Amino acid sequence: MSQKRIHQIERRIDRIKTALLEIGPMRPGSLTRQYKDPQYHAGAYWQISYTRRMKSRTEYVRREWVKDLRRQIASHKRFKSLVEQWIDLSIEHSQLTMQVADPKVT
């Protein structure tokens, strides 16, 4: 059973690696619409906020770039999700490999 699970994990890791190769431009952050006068929703503008290397930043975004930035943010979220899955699977793979090599140890 463990050997079978190890092979499943290896196949899943290979699929994750392939998916990572297909990720295009990416950028962390959240894109929000702000208003100069929030009560009347007047003076709308876009901004992106993100934290990188423990430093928080906020930048204004032109309307024509909103669509591209949404794609880049989605790519970054996908990247982070895939990396997390890879790490979880790698830990499980390591544990199973050690159990198969020495079944006496739990």
List the predicted regions and their residue ranges.
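A positively charged, amphipathic N-terminal helix/segment that binds anionic biomolecules
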Residues: 1-106
